[in-house]
Amino acid sequence: MSLSGLGDTGKAEPPPALFPAPDSDAPAPARRRGGQPQNGPPRNGSVQGDDAGRQLVFFGAEAAEPAVADLAGLLAGPGEVVRMGGTARLSVQVDAAWRVHVLVAELAARGLAASWEPTEGERHAVRTSYTRVLKPLAAAWLHGSAKRPPATFHLTGRRLRLWLAAAGTPEPPDACLLRLGADDQECWEPTGVALAAAGLAGTLLGPADGGPAYRITGRRRLARLAELVGDPPRAAPPEAWPT
């Protein structure tokens, strides 16, 4: 199976208009196993105010430089982290080629080499190398082998941007679905609390209702989400990002 814009040979193929090839001036490239570097730049937009218009957004996507701590946004969703000795590796499965482009570039912007490969069900696995850089993140989120947010967990614009890029789906006209890890029940409730604290209170959908996921509804909440995550990445289809 060929990933749009990332050919099976490892060489870039002319991508469909829906999945534009990443810019050549993107951050450090990542490689598909046995392939050539692939890039995909994140593009952040401006953030202005909260959903009630009463205070500034202090945690929008442009409020700080990219940091490894932002990857907590992937772990709030379906991302996984595993430890090996004094190192750790983060991985996430996604359902579209544009998500691969965006996540590889976001990881590179944080100094993390990444690879990708196709998986079952026309999905794609994006993963970092094992690195000591991710050890603190793994220590905070892993309790034995179970993933659970630390007590201090909160959602910023950059964390939400990564979660949206990995597993977010707008549902016009006034909803957005943020998917969770199917086996991460211990994460679901505290993640909902963090969403509410960010002004994005959502409804938890169980597996029987098309989840697990949080559905964010209402124009004001969607405007808040759009403010926090910034402009869509270049590789994202217009309908795949809240505006």
Set out the residue ranges of the language-model regions.
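Internal intein/HINT superfamily modules and their associated LAGLIDADG
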Residues: 1-243
